[in-house]
UniProtKB/Swiss-Prot annotation:
EC top class, as a word: isomerase
EC number(s) recorded for this UniProt protein: 5.4.99.25
Organism of derivation: Nitrosospira multiformis (strain ATCC 25196 / NCIMB 11849 / C 71)
Active-site feature positions: 46
Record bears the keyword RNA-binding: no
Record's protein name: tRNA pseudouridine synthase B
Gene Ontology biological process: mRNA pseudouridine synthesis; tRNA pseudouridine synthesis
Catalytic reaction(s) noted: uridine(55) in tRNA = pseudouridine(55) in tRNA
GO molecular function, one term: RNA binding
The encoding gene: truB
Length: 313
């Protein structure tokens, strides 16, 4: 391959992002390492944060949104009794209001009661430093200009919250949550609930996302050091993004119809009921992944996003 040329590769790279890199910087570096023609990620991680960042190449980018609503697991370190303008170590730090002493002393009973109160469906006010849009602009643009925007509380789901360690002002937590959860805000809210006036994140690591976890991930440094001929073996197939959906196998005639944009009569996968609006993974008889389909009210399977093949079926 000549220098500077791009490859039309497809697949999913599970990246272990380093701290200090924005998600886009990590994406562009991975794209360069693989000489990929097209790439995209499945949702951002803050620059300070480390951990799992799935990156899609080629045809896999069509399904990158599949993980936006997936559950996530984080490991975080909180500094209790202090606040940050950004909710993390990158902002301006100050002693939390009402904290005459910088010393925090909590009982196990207090910690356990607060921990339990945060599990389930709770409300959370999104932070100013977020990508949520206000009048067409990300909220963080207003925050950087010193403008405070009123935000409405949102319902989020905390599936599990464990206190891994606690000593002095430092608390380590592990949280599994639904989409839309801001761990920076969770840290602040935990600090308030514990009677510490607040808290901020000193470290954040995403360890799992939508069925993927860190042991499967690669670092940019490791990929750079790897022989180019071995890098493609690090990629997962595009359909790994959709493995929570039921598979439907179709014959060659139906596969051709789907690829031509036509709906086909629904076929029930084993043990599955195809209700209207249900999305499915589509395969041909050779178990080749065709793409994503959706069940219509008439029971037909309509093509939603399909893989482009260089050769005909």
């Amino acid at each position: 391959m000549s220098p500077g040329s791009k490859r039309h590769i497809s697949g999913v790279l599970l990246l272990d992002k380093a701290s200090g890199l924005s998600s886009n910087q990590a994406l562009q570096t991975a794209k360069r390492i693989f000489s990929a023609h097209k790439a995209g990620h499945t949702g951002t991680l803050d620059p300070m944060a480390t951990g799992l960042l799935p990156i899609c190449f080629g045809e896999a980018t069509k399904f990158s949104s599949a993980l936006l609503g997936a559950d996530k697991t984080y490991e975080a370190v909180l500094r209790l009794g202090y606040m940050s303008t950004t909710g993390d170590a990158e902002g301006e730090i100050s002693i939390a209001a009402g904290m005459e002493s910088q010393y925090v002393d909590l009982t196990r009973e207090k910690i356990e009661a607060v921990r339990k109160s945060f599990i389930g469906v709770i409300t959370q006010v999104p932070p100013m430093y977020s990508a949520i849009k206000h009048r067409g602009k990300p909220m963080y643009t207003f925050a950087r200009a010193g403008v405070e925007i009123e935000r409405q509380p949102r319902a989020i789901t905390i599936h599990d919250l464990s206190i891994e360690a606690y000593q002095g002002n430092e608390m380590r937590i592990r949280v599994t949550c639904g989409s839309g959860t801001y761990i920076r805000t969770l840290a602040e809210d935990l600090g308030h609930a514990l009677g510490c006036g607040g808290a901020y994140l000193t470290a954040l690591r995403r360890s799992a996302l939508g069925g993927f976890d860190l042991p499967q991930a690669y670092t940019l440094t490791g990929l750079e050091a790897m022989p180019p001929s071995q890098r493609d073996s690090c990629l997962l197939p595009a359909d790994s993004l959709l493995r929570s959906l039921p598979p439907v196998v179709v014959d060659s005639a139906a596969a051709l119809s789907l690829l031509q944009g036509r709906a086909i009569p629904g076929t029930h996968p084993a043990g599955e009921s195809l209700l209207p609006g249900r999305q499915v993974r589509l395969y041909d008889k050779a178990q080749r992944f065709l793409g994503l389909g959706e069940i219509s009210t008439e029971g037909y399977i309509s093509p939603k996003r399909l893989i482009r093949f260089e050769q005909s079926l």
